[in-house]
Amino acid sequence: FKLAPEEALGAPHFLMMGLNQETNGSYYRWDVSYSVSFPTRWERLKANIDLALHRVLWMGPGDLALHEAKKALVNFNDGTFAWKMDGGERFSISGGPVFPTEHELIWSTALQALWLGVLGGCLLYAFAAADRNSVTLWLCLLGVMAMVMLFECRARYLYANVPIFILAAVLGARSLAARVRGR
């Protein structure tokens, strides 16, 4: 396996893809075809930046805000993190002895409830007393959120950072418990 830097799709490609309205900022085959149609890395970077700016200007502030709201739903509304969806169905664990198909609804509902609890805990953490550690954790959370809101949204990008969200949620719940005990 040999890396080919000249053929790489850089950050502007993923920014451009994150601004496509056709798939609410998710993978879009046309964007990939467009990017790889440029023979050099610099031509590709310039074309991606130009198209990203064109999309922002074409949407305007109102449509851009609506687009980002849709991306927030794509990124944060699924506690299963696009289980069995992201990347096609090349591999499935349902229908086997661990996750029989008839329990899929229960499984996905439980995961959704857990994820909503984690997001709720993060919200509680937002109102916790700030210290040096909390600022560091908030910077991590904001960085992850900015990444998935600016660039292509895929469940795997958020899923890789779930421990950060869980830590913030636990600290948020702990802060709430301390406030309740203090009253």
Predicted feature residues:
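Transmembrane-helix signature of polytopic, lipid-linked glycan biosynthesis machinery
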Residues: 125, 141-156
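Membrane-proximal stem/loop segments at transmembrane-domain junctions that anchor or position
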Residues: 1-89
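Membrane-interface junctions at the ends of membrane-embedded or membrane-associated helices
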Residues: 127-135, 169-183
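Lipid-exposed faces of alpha-helical membrane segments in multi-pass integral membrane proteins
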Residues: 117-120, 139-147, 161, 169
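Membrane-interface anchor segments at the N-terminal boundary of transmembrane helices
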Residues: 67-137
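Hydrophobic/aromatic-rich transmembrane helices and adjacent perimembrane loops
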Residues: 154-174
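Short, aromatic-rich membrane-interface segments at the entry and exit
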Residues: 133-138, 156-160
